[in-house]
Amino acid sequence: MHCAACDYQSSVIAGTIFQDTHLPLTLWFRAIWYITSQKNGTSALGLQRILGLGSYRTAWAWLHKLRRAMVRPGRDRLHGRVEVDGTFVGGEEDGISGRRRGDKSLIVVAVEVEGKGIGRIRLRSIQDASANSLHSFVVDSIEPDSTVHTDGWQGYKGLEQKNYKCESTVIGKQRKDAVKLMPHVHLVISLLKRWLLGTHQGAASRAHMAYYLDEFTFRFNRRTSKSRGKLFYRLVQQAVTTAPAPYDQLVQSRKSTSSSKPQALGVT
């Protein structure tokens, strides 16, 4: 685009995730269609192979740019009855067990309970299971006056002061206890772990875990959609309203978090 008055030149893809791309938009659209048409998504290696991209780095960057566009800022919060719990996902370190999980990512999950079924979900990678981290997640993800059901971990205490109705169920050390007492959130946790292991072979790094969580949330919250075309349209729509992210910005989080490890407290 060219402004005759000031001689300024711009592009229709400026300010979008497509900005500065050297490959045709039709290839981007093929990537979006493939990603949204696959039930479990794809890995960067799979996308490189399907599109015939010459570089794994390009496929990796495209996937992360699209994941950034999958979750809208300011989206509606969960409401009603919501189960909240934490879990660890990702890699392990030899000789580390119990509550210190090395390079694993600490994830907090919130799930709307609709009768015997599940509504929408929210997920976040957090540094620790402190009240500050957990309260911030709840406030950002769940509407006040909702009923928040947790496992009784001390980090959830005080949510009543933020206008939440709180229920806590003390859960034993056995995983089967958690699954029985809080079935909805633990079903989502199980599906998340299966997806990370199956589609990405467990290779999602802690530095970039937020992007993978955004993709899982995008897919899960649209799981009942019968039209792949609507998913394609939605992702394209959000891609053109998402700010560009150069490759260096995408990898920066890896450098800045490589020496830090999550402080795991009270999650199973």
Predicted regions span which residues?
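Residue-level recognition of single "structural anchor" positions
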Residues: 1-268
